[in-house]
Regions:
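Glycine-rich FAD pyrophosphate-binding loop
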Residues: 32-52
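Dinucleotide-binding Rossmann-like beta1-alpha1 core, especially the glycine-rich loop
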Residues: 56-141
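A conserved short coil-to-beta-strand element within the FAD-binding core of flavoproteins
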Residues: 183-204
């Protein structure tokens, strides 16, 4: 995946996507697989905001049943099934427990009814349907649950993902199918033709600056997509005629990394007072607990977890634990922003999670994406590209009407039996590349059928087969692969997004940061000053500190 902003010159694209989060990535992939001329730019790194700071869930929409959003539940369950089939390395099933306590806003009967509807909407076989559990059943599975007040509960299945890697794999596939993609490329302004779209103003070009070099480029396109998430209205404000209206509502969601108190189970439970719930997932031998849901009106680039968020989440989980967690038990924390479609009068938790497409009369050939979820990102991209194709009559090839992402695996997903593949491929990785077994198993599960590409740098440099300092199963080869093939240009790009290591292992990996910086320096031509500054910047960043 090459970053060549000069490729913008001399090309009029069919569609330019601004924003490299999951919505933009899925749209770029959909359009590229249909044969469109596609470009995607992001002012920061791909998955640099919301799409690396989510709850990591690919879920069937159980939480939406309470809001009677049945269409959204049906869509989410369909998309979850597709992702499991087309990218098994990016959507893995996890058992969820739902303990019910005295005083909860929902009774065991209501939960059973909701899960029965959930099963029916998903057309599940007997093995995947929910189970009703007694108090004793729950305690056998999670001995650390609080016994007092426990009435019983349920077990059902959903899926987890690595949100940033899901985003990256979509962008990689878009680039493999001809899309021109660039991170650290910010749109500065637009030029419009006042009568190009049936008498309405239409964007003809945009000026883009390379944030790494300061060089500016012009990019031309027939259609534009504003998929910048929390920055949607900031991009709209660049257009002449912008009226100051808001299309998205920003709410802050904080997650904390804690010890694995529920083992290999994920868990939902009520947060009192009110009707909110927390979710806790098994994540890299830890627990990932979230989330808060509060309005946010400040700079989207400065969102951080604060101590009030951490304490709120600890109070929520401690209600159902026999041994309460302390702030000293918190291993890490992160905060992201939901860019929800505006719904006047709704509280943050009640605001619809359905996505919407918005068009302004002062830019007839731009659609702004409002809302969206990891789970439904593929169908969002499909519907959006359908709308774009319908807006570009006269030169639309027949292939533009196809829906290729319904059946095309994501990179790494080309296998019919993932578990058998993982077992065989891990053995091959150890034999062919002489890497530690633990690293081989994790790499195969993370990258799927792309595992050999990930380990290829080892053939050039045997040092890249060694685990990073402080890690049992992360190799220098992955750093080199991310730089060469996934457009990792800064340490954060690898630590926060290509690997996610900083979210749960930054302290353990402190000694590995100079080692990674050396690999970046060798590949990108950094001098000693740049290398040392990158290390120092990482150490000062304080990704886990709550203010």
């Amino acid at each position: 995946m090459n970053r060549k902003l000069e490729s913008f010159a001399g090309t009029t694209f069919d569609i330019v996507i601004i924003g490299g989060g999951i919505n933009g990535a899925a749209t770029a992939r959909e359009a590229a697989l249909r044969g469109m001329k596609v470009a995607l730019v992001d002012a920061h790194d791909f998955a640099g905001a919301t799409s690396s700071r989510s709850s990591k869930l690919i879920h069937g929409g159980l939480r939406y049943l309470d809001q009677l959003e049945f269409r959204l539940v049906h869509e989410a369950r369909r998309e979850r099934r597709l992702l499991r089939e087309l990218a098994p390395h990016l959507a893995w099933p996890v058992p969820f427990l739902f303990p019910i306590y005295q005083g909860d806003p929902f009774s065991p009967l209501k939960v059973r009814l909701g899960l029965t509807i959930y099963d029916l909407l998903g057309n599940l076989g007997t093995a995947d349907r929910h189970q009703t559990l007694s108090k004793e059943d729950l305690l056998r599975r999670v001995p650390l649950l609080q016994i007092e007040g426990l009435l019983g509960g349920s077990l059902y299945h959903d899926s987890l993902t690595d949100d940033a890697r899901l985003t990256i794999e979509n962008i990689v596939d878009a680039a493999d199918h001809g899309a021109v993609v660039a991170n650290y490329a910010k749109v500065l302004n637009f030029d419009l033709d006042s009568g190009k779209a049936n008498g309405s103003p239409a964007i003809t070009t945009a000026e883009v600056v390379d944030n790494l070099t300061g060089k500016r480029y012009e990019i031309s396109s027939r259609f534009w997509v504003n998929a910048t998430g929390p920055w949607v209205d900031y991009v709209r404000a660049l257009l002449p005629g912008y009226d100051g209206s808001k299309t998205v509502r920003l709410t802050k969601g904080t997650h904390i990394v804690i010890p694995p108190v529920a083992g290999d189970f994920a868990m939902f439970a009520a947060i009192l007072p009110g009707k909110r719930i927390f979710v806790m997932m098994p994540w890299h031998r830890h627990g990932l607990l979230g989330t808060t849901d509060t309005d946010y009106d400040d700079d989207p680039g400065q969102v951080r977890p604060d101590i009030a968020d951490v304490e709120y989440l600890l109070r929520a989980v401690n209600r159902v634990l026999s041994k309460p967690l302390q702030t000293s038990d918190v291993i890490g924390a992160y905060a992201g922003l939901r860019a929800l479609a505006v719904q006047p009068g709704a509280s943050p938790s009640e605001n619809t999670r359905e996505y919407r497409f918005h068009q302004d009369p002062w830019a007839a050939n731009m659609i702004a994406v409002c809302g969206g979820k990891l789970t439904t990102s593929r169908s969002l991209g499909e519907k959006l590209v359908d709308q774009v194709a319908a807006s570009l009559p006269g030169s639309s090839p027949a292939g533009w009407a196809e829906h290729p992402t319904r059946k095309t695996p994501l990179p790494g997903g080309h296998t019919d039996n993932f578990e058998r593949f993982c077992k065989d491929a891990a053995a091959d990785a150890v034999r062919l590349f002489n890497v530690p077994r633990a690293a081989a198993e994790r790499i195969v599960r993370t990258y799927g059928t792309r595992w050999q590409q990930v380990l290829e740098p080892v053939r050039r440099d045997r040092k890249l087969a060694d685990p990073l300092a402080g890690s049992e199963n992360y190799l220098g080869a992955e750093v080199a692969f991310a730089i060469e093939n996934e457009m990792a240009l800064e340490l954060d790009d690898f630590l926060l997004r290509r690997s996610g290591l900083s979210w749960y292992a930054a302290h353990a990996l402190a000694d590995a940061v100079p080692q990674m910086a050396e690999i970046f320096a060798e590949h990108l031509g950094w001098d000693a000053a740049k290398r040392d500054a990158a290390v120092e910047d990482f150490r000062k960043a304080g990704y886990f500190r709550a203010s």
